[in-house]
Amino acid sequence: MDSGGKLKFYRILTSVILGAFIIYSNLYWVQPLITLFSKSFNQSPASASLVLSITTIALALGLLFAPFLSNNLGRKNTMVYSLLLTSLFNMMSMVIDHFYWLLLMRFLIGICISGFLASVITYLIEEVKKEWLGRVVGIYVAGTALGGVLARTISSLLVEHYELSTVAVIIGGATLIASNLFWIMLPQSSNFIKRTYALIHLKNGFMASLLDNKIRGIYIAHFFTIGIYTSVLNYISYPLTKPPYSFNQSVIGLFYFATLSGVVGSLLFGRLIGKFFDISLYRISLLIMAVGAVLTTSHILWFVITGLIIFAFGIFASNTMASNWIANNAPSTHKTEANSLYSIFYYLGSSIIGWLSGYLFLFFGWSIFIFLLSGLLVLTAFLLRGKKHELELEDHSYQKNENST
């Protein structure tokens, strides 16, 4: 790689880390404050969790059309507009003290985020050499972990000194400045070719990706995986505010530093993919998550912290594996749609399971809630299987028919 190529590579690398930080800061700063939103707006835990779930629902809906926008505006322009609008809407999210106004702004934030997510992996596929792609995607996913954990921690610390509305303005303002830096640093696409694109092409791309045995199983599995991750982080603040812990909000925010282990998980699995690109890595990451989740049911504080560390390591390792699997196995003419469909399943799982699981938590309590989620992770790992470079959910009826012939 010559000096010009190195400079471009590092500009891309720095920019996507910054973009990940911006997106996931605006997305997740509300998560550790769900208990406060519940009190401020007189909402149940499940209803208060809509401040996150409504955003991820909108994100999933936006991803249905974001590839069309990405193709027409170009990768960089789509990402820049997405980041700027996301930050502005976040600053406006609590200018009116009403729960439904907040939900409206969070919905619009989700729509804007979809533009970035529909473009970033495709941009990397187009602009980064294949031998470096796995590592760069791993670093990008690590950036998402960093953005999420810093946003959760900073918002928890800020809310001890400022109103929720002020916290929204501070985070939105900081990411607005960062969005302009992203605009300046990210190189223009040099390998992007604008296609003649109609909505029928979008539909065909989604269907081709959904029917592809190599990637369909990942879509389904990650729907549940990210939903479980969101559920644990949505509601863990409730048991931490009660005996034997009785922590205040700023202390609870520090627990989210444990999820920085996701950076290690992303980087480690990003390297492993280059040497051992097999779906068994994904199954291992799900089992790691299950072990970590179970540890959070302990009344021993260090077990809870260790559990969160292991749990976050597992989810970000699985994200890296899944993102690379889609990038390498998606239909060659439908890369953008395949990545968008992955994100749709990802965020639908986050919103639907993250919201509905709140009722399980209310009904069963923390320990049984966690054992149910961990059991689902183990079941998913068991049902997934790899056959050469194919990936599919285990179909017992199909196997039975095969054995009888």
Question: What would you call each of these model-derived segments?
Answer:
Residues L61-D97:
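Conserved MFS/SLC helix-loop-helix module at the cytosolic interface between two early adjacent transmembrane helices
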Residues N42, G74, V95-W101, C112, ...:
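Helix-breaking motifs and short loop linkers at transmembrane-helix boundaries and internal kinks
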Residues M105-G143:
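Cytoplasmic helix-loop-helix junction between adjacent transmembrane helices
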Residues L63-G74, G265-F277, F361:
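Helix-to-loop junctions at the C-terminal end of transmembrane segments
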Residues L85, F89, Y100-L108, W302-I310:
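Paired small-residue
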Residues N329-W366:
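A late C-terminal transmembrane helix in Major Facilitator Superfamily
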